[in-house]
A protein has these predicted regions:
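Well-ordered, non-membrane alpha-helical segments in soluble/globular domains
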Residues: 24-29, 84-88
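Conserved catalytic-core motifs of GNAT/GCN5-like acyltransferases
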Residues: 105, 123-134
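Conserved donor-binding loop and adjoining core beta-sheet/short helix segment
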Residues: 44-79
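Short amphipathic alpha-helix that is part of the acyltransferase structural core
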Residues: 1-27
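Acyl-donor binding region in acyl/amide transferases
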Residues: 65-120
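Short secondary-structure junctions
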Residues: 3-4, 121-125
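Short glycine-aromatic motifs
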Residues: 38-40, 118-123
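A short helix-loop-beta-strand connector motif used in the catalytic cores of GNAT acetyltransferases and
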Residues: 31-46
């Protein structure tokens, strides 16, 4: 069962999941985002251990549309079917929050993401060009 959490210890456990992903967020940044509150929602599936988690945010995107942004999503690889449950859950949350779109940012290969997320109706809309300043 996917449920909303506001427990600081669970936030820390979610931060530990970063080491199992290629996510570029730091633990400090993810934790800060989760405790920020207002437009951020954190959901988990925990039975004996954490099987999955989602950190989402509701804001206006660059075109002004209310958008549910997936900040961080993790599934235990032993529970692959949970992925489909979280995709449906995120869509229901977007409807609940009256969002017009769902978006996420990733640094993974565009082709692999399009293949995986295309099954759920997602498509590439923007490209991000950046220059790192030291």
């Amino acid at each position: 069962m996917i449920k909303e959490i506001k427990d600081i210890n669970t936030y820390l456990e979610i931060c530990d999941k970063l080491e199992y992903t290629d996510c570029k967020l730091s633990k400090k940044a993810l934790y800060g985002f989760m405790v920020a509150g207002k437009n951020v929602h954190v959901y988990t599936t925990i039975e004996e251990e954490m099987k999955g988690c989602a950190v989402i945010s509701v804001n206006n995107d660059i075109s002004g549309d209310l958008t549910l942004s997936v900040v961080f999503l993790w599934m235990n690889p032993h529970y692959r079917k949970l992925w489909k449950n979280y995709m449906k859950f995120i869509e229901l949350k977007a409807i609940e929050f009256h969002c017009k779109k769902i978006s996420f940012t990733t640094s993974r290969s565009e082709k692999s993401i399009e293949r995986q997320m295309g099954k759920y109706g997602y498509k590439k809309v923007y490209s991000i060009i950046e220059k790192e300043l030291i």
